[in-house]
Regions:
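Short beta-strand-loop/turn "lid" adjacent to the catalytic site in phosphate-handling enzymes
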Residues: 54-97, 109-110
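Conserved phosphate-binding catalytic cores of ATP/NTP-utilizing and phosphoryl-transfer enzymes
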Residues: 1-2, 94-117, 134
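ATP-binding/phosphotransfer module of carbohydrate and carboxylate kinases, centering on a glycine-rich
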Residues: 1-58, 64, 86, 108-114, ...
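Short, active-site-adjacent cap segments at secondary-structure transitions
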Residues: 75-77, 104-106, 125-126, 257-260
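Short glycine-aspartate micro-motif
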Residues: 6-10, 64-68, 97, 115-119, ...
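Active-site nucleophile and cofactor-binding loops and adjacent substrate-binding regions
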Residues: 96-104, 119-120, 275-285
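Glycine-rich phosphate-binding loop of actin/hexokinase-like ATP-binding domains
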Residues: 113-166
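Glycine-rich beta-strand-to-loop/alpha-helix junction loops that act as flexible
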Residues: 68-75, 120-122, 248-258
Length: 319
């Protein structure tokens, strides 16, 4: 009897991550590809990213009992049928489900059990799942209307301060960090980058770690920006807890969750309301869990094995 295989894909705005596991939660393959938010890079590039991840994992040509793709940018105005069709073109499976990539994080946070999960990556949102499996979402308005507490928002807040430094109205290290990071040599270059050239949100959000670095070193403006964004996530999580009947626990995923300084501010913001917990599974393994559950309810040993692998990959910096 051939081994049952399950594939989960975290098709994010910055990169695509893919994991293949067997029915017992053992890892068979792991791969990465480029950005996969079709709203930012288009459907053709999105498909290329899926193929890149499949090839990187060495799983092209395999048949899967169940597959799940969490697409960044999948929402009310997205071509769901077309995204599903592309998924079938890339993956050999009779059982494919797709949804927004936030569900990868939500089901990974506590293995699909009650709790709140905050996503703090290029974008941001807060989600909750109750004992009945009902999902509630706050935030997630995108980079134009919201994304408070995200890498993109921290980067843009810092860039605006940097321009004030350029004008001489504020004192901060952020101007020099911005000029160096983006390779600007003049004010004309700054304007050209943001108003004329085409740059992705993830490229801009990549500046956020330098803002946090400046905050840790004592830069007042950088500290204010990071603290304010962390508190926005904390405030939204507390509002969620008061709105929905869920367990009083919060897991945080995304690039900013790796910053001790950011997490310290967030922990302070939810103190007395929510217990800050380590996610059971990183989002890509949350996607695998969804694929497995769509075929057959995952047993406890398999879930524990998935969690072990997820933890190993996180500790080794392989995610």
């Amino acid at each position: 009897m051939e081994r049952e295989l399950f594939i989960g894909i975290d098709a994010g705005g910055s990169e695509t991550k893919l994991a293949v596991c067997d029915g017992r939660g053992n890892l068979v393959g792991y791969g990465k590809g480029g950005p996969a938010n079709h709203l930012s890079v288009g459907l053709e590039r999105m498909k290329e990213s899926l193929v890149e991840a499949m090839n990187d994992a060495g799983c092209s040509g395999l048949h899967f009992e169940s597959a799940y793709i969490g697409y960044s940018g999948l929402g009310i105005w997205s071509p769901s049928e077309l995204l599903e069709k592309i998924g079938h073109e890339v993956i050999d499976t009779d059982r494919l489900a797709i949804n927004n990539d936030c569900y990868n994080a939500l089901y990974g946070g506590f293995g699909g059990e009650s709790g709140i999960v905050a996503v703090t990556g290029t974008g941001s949102m807060v989600l909750a799942i109750d004992d009945d499996g009902e999902v509630t979402r706050l935030g997630g308005w995108g980079h134009i209307l919201g994304d408070w507490g995200s890498g993109f928002r921290i980067a843009m807040d810092a860039i605006q301060v940097a321009l004030k430094v350029h004008d001489g109205t504020v004192d901060s290290l952020l101007h020099d960090k911005m000029m160096s990071f983006f390779g600007f040599d003049s004010s004309r270059a700054i304007v050209r980058y943001f108003y004329i050239e085409q740059h992705s949100k993830s490229e801009i959000a990549a500046f956020a770690p330098l803002v946090i670095e400046a905050a840790v070193s004592g830069d007042r403006e950088a500290r204010r920006i990071v603290e304010a964004n962390a508190i926005e996530i904390a405030r939204t999580a507390v509002v969620m807890y008061n709105k929905v009947a869920v367990a009083p626990r919060l897991a945080v995923v995304g690039g900013l969750s790796k910053s001790e300084f950011f997490m310290e501010q967030l922990r302070w913001g939810v103190s007395g309301w929510l217990k800050l917990c380590k996610p059971l599974l990183q989002p890509v393994f949350g996607a695998v869990l969804i694929a497995m559950n769509n075929f057959r309810k995952v047993d406890k040993p398999s879930l524990e094995r998935l969690s072990e692998i997820s933890g190993e990959y996180e500790r080794e910096g392989r995610l």
